[in-house]
Amino acid sequence: MITIDGNGAVASVAFRTSEVIAIYPITPSSTMAEQADAWAGNGLKNVWGDVPRVVEMQSEAGAIGAVHGALQTGALSTSFTSSQGLLLMIPTLYKLAGQLMPFVLHVAARTVATHALSIFGDHSDVMAVRQTGCAMLCASSVQEAQDFALISHIATLQSRVPFIHFFDGFRTSHEINKIAPLADDTLLSLLPQDKIDEHRQRALNPEHPVIRGTSANPDTY
């Protein structure tokens, strides 16, 4: 057993199962991005023995755009966000779902600011992305947050449907509790390597070029 908060539990799984992590901090998800950046800076490796590349973009829109590019080149990618940050990602979430990109976005759910800023928790952010085509999985404890993070990374590879894994901001993201940690060998044994290989084979490559993102008329769209 280890003592950890929800953000730390999720970040650990996401970091160890990813190759490219695009970030832009926003409360209360910031510590997931901060920990991933610190781990990469310290040379911590993922389950395949590589140090994930963590890149901070200019906004959440840039972060999800970087994720999209990484996925198109066959990398395993993830990101973290909350509130208005999630809303900035909506256009690209539609693209990721439509292009069947395996990807997990970890969301510490938080109130969307309207007449005033609020950093407190509700589901107004995640409820705004229900129509994007992404699957959604909600965790309600620190243990669930860790376990569902892994389940999301497995399920998105199996289904080629992007997953939004969310949990309550502060109430779960900052809750400190004892959990049973997931070891590297457990992660590696549960991740579907055949689906990872298929994802890499679909990568854009100048050796066998393809066209993606074309314009379509109503008869075929």
Functional labels for PLM-detected ranges:
Residues 48, 52, 163-221:
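Conformationally flexible catalytic loops at phosphate/diphosphate-handling active centers
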Residues 58-64, 113-118, 137-145, 172-175, ...:
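Low-complexity, flexible helical/coil segments
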Residues 1-128, 133, 150, 169-170:
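Thiamine diphosphate
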Residues 6, 28, 144, 157, ...:
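Short, contiguous, pocket-lining structural segments
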Residues 119-169, 193-194:
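Conserved thiamine diphosphate
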Residues 98, 152, 179-181:
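Short basic, glycine-rich beta-strand/loop surfaces that mediate nucleic-acid
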